[in-house]
A protein has these predicted regions:
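Interaction/scaffold regions that mediate signaling and macromolecular assembly across diverse proteins
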Residues: 1-179
């Protein structure tokens, strides 16, 4: 398989699916669970867990940071919606699912909307917007669009939540909480 010859959306879809399968495969076969609260084992897990694709080995870290986040890859732009498609097998990330190359755009929209609808909360009176931890971890990816994280997320929540975010954001004492 020559990955360079794949259209960009097929390539993105391929690596999202490989990432999710690799996480699931590794968690099932690993003796030591990797959870949200243990940073060192998690970092090691992402650097050392890999699949061979053709002649090359791709670790979870290579796939997420290098290919999908476009840090080492010249043929893909970073699409922040990938963060709502990648499952790390933790409570702070979405559940693993398989994506289709020909419907990837709409599936990424749907995954993003579903995750944000479940996780984004707003307290207008208190001036607090609660966002998923993913938004803090990858804030630079969201902000690369020219929007703040809050503005970016507002496009993927129900209208009443987006209106609440806008009202809370107008306050001088706005607080953003990540959980």
């Amino acid at each position: 398989m020559n990955l360079i010859q794949l259209p960009v959306e097929e390539l993105r879809c391929f690596f999202i699916n490989i990432f999710n399968v690799l996480v699931l495969h590794s968690k099932v076969t690993s003796k030591a669970p990797v959870d949200d609260d243990h940073v060192v084992p998690r970092c090691s897990f992402f650097r050392n867990t890999s699949y061979q694709v053709g002649k090359y080995f791709y670790s979870l870290d290579d796939i997420c940071r290098g290919v999908l986040r476009a840090k080492k890859c010249l043929f893909l732009d970073c699409d922040p919606r990938i963060h709502f498609a990648l499952s790390y097998g933790t409570r702070h990330t979405p559940q693993a699912r398989v994506f289709g190359a020909h419907s990837l755009d709409s599936e990424l929209d749907s995954a993003t909307r579903n995750f944000c609808t479940d996780r984004v909360r707003v307290d207008v009176e208190g001036g607090v917007v609660t966002l998923p931890l993913l938004c803090e971890w990858y804030s630079k990816d969201f902000e690369a669009s020219g929007k703040t994280v809050i503005e970016w997320v507002s496009a993927f929540v129900p209208p009443n939540v987006a209106a609440g975010i806008a009202a809370a954001s107008a306050r001088k004492d706005l607080r953003v909480v990540y959980e």
